[in-house]
Amino acid sequence: MKCMPPPLREILDDVLAGHRLTEEEAVRLLATRDRGVWEIAAAANELRERKVGNVVTYVRNQNINVTNLCVNACGFCGFSRKPGDADAFFYGETAVRGKAREARERGVTEVCTVSGLHPEFDVQSYAEIYSWIRDEVPGVHIHASNPMEVAYAARRSGISTREVMELMRGAGLSTLCGTAAEILVDDVRRVICPDKIDTGSWARIIREAHGLGIRSTATIMYGHCESEADRARHLNILREIQDETHGFTEFVPLSFIHKNTPLYRAGLARAGATGREDLLMFAVARLFLDNFDHIQASWVKVGTKMAEMALLSGADDLGGTLFEESISREAGARDTDYLDPAEMRRMAEDLGRVLRQRTTTYALLPG
């Protein structure tokens, strides 16, 4: 039987012995093809078991996309609309409160809200949304906004990003979404999201949030026009931040949904990641991010079957129930609104594991 080349086998043996992967080693692993993919996945799976055992987790949450109106025009996004577009929408107080009441009736522990950059939003707009949710669902964990929204609110309000997050927290924000990271390489960002904050600004705002005691997720959006070296650089930036702050709750690989995006239609991006790339993203993340406990397999982005395979490749979490999801659907994903915990349990048990409900910050709940 053909085996993995000795130099790559040595990398896996070293990391299983406690060696910290370098960017160069990560690039070599991410570029692996043929049977070597399975060996990398197996090594990642072993590290996952050492770190978190055989529990698969999920969070009972509801997503609320408040508006698709956005001042930016990111090439990877099929969600954003401009004022006057026939399918543009904005949910005001009555609608947001109504959706929050639905969340309460569904017994969620988390409400997640990230939206377009509405032309008229400032920090008070975000604070009002959080306060409406908090009023309707007392005690719920509000996981919301991201560094881009923080920077936008700061610019619109004439205050610092730190002040924005202090005001957001006062209004009910619990943790910050680690989205808007995409690829933390500015040459790539200039192609896929030229109007978004740069890498340094994203990292600075995340560090500020963690310094304020506001924890966040960490993400990568891959499978468009980036290289393996870009992915490795991105992972290294996240690892460096986590070394400093210990503020990331999880890492979430987000596979690029290409179908309805300007970037793909203009020929500037490939048709998303392959299955090999998906598995290696989860596996190499587990091997590289030695200071992260949890890696989420987003069923919205990769589908339930690939999410289950990700659980064999280093991932330990299936994300949320969501109930409502618009951003991935508008980009061309299917069946993105809801995944029943019963189906998550079937996936976990198929692998001989136990499904447990968690909080946003990974405390296990009874039952």
From Swiss-Prot:
Cofactor(s) the protein requires to work: [4Fe-4S] cluster
Reactions performed catalytically: 5-amino-6-(D-ribitylamino)uracil + L-tyrosine + S-adenosyl-L-methionine = 5-amino-5-(4-hydroxybenzyl)-6-(D-ribitylimino)-5,6-dihydrouracil + 2-iminoacetate + 5'-deoxyadenosine + L-methionine + H(+)
Co-factor binding details: Binds 1 [4Fe-4S] cluster. The cluster is coordinated with 3 cysteines and an exchangeable S-adenosyl-L-methionine.
CDD domains assigned: Radical_SAM
GO molecular function, one term: 4 iron, 4 sulfur cluster binding
InterPro entries on file: Aldolase_TIM, CofH/MnqC-like_C, CofH_family, F420, FO_synthase_su2, rSAM
Keyword entries, A-Z: 4Fe-4S, Iron, Iron-sulfur, Metal-binding, S-adenosyl-L-methionine, Transferase
PROSITE patterns found in the cross-reference section: RADICAL_SAM
Binding site for [4Fe-4S] cluster: C70, C74, C77
Record-annotated Radical SAM core domain positions: 56-290
This protein's record includes keyword Transmembrane helix: no
Role, per record: Catalyzes the radical-mediated synthesis of 5-amino-5-(4-hydroxybenzyl)-6-(D-ribitylimino)-5,6-dihydrouracil from 5-amino-6-(D-ribitylamino)uracil and L-tyrosine.
Record note on quaternary structure: Consists of two subunits, CofG and CofH.
Family listed: Belongs to the radical SAM superfamily. CofH family.
Protein name, per record: 5-amino-6-(D-ribitylamino)uracil--L-tyrosine 4-hydroxyphenyl transferase
Organism name: Methanoculleus marisnigri (strain ATCC 35101 / DSM 1498 / JR1)
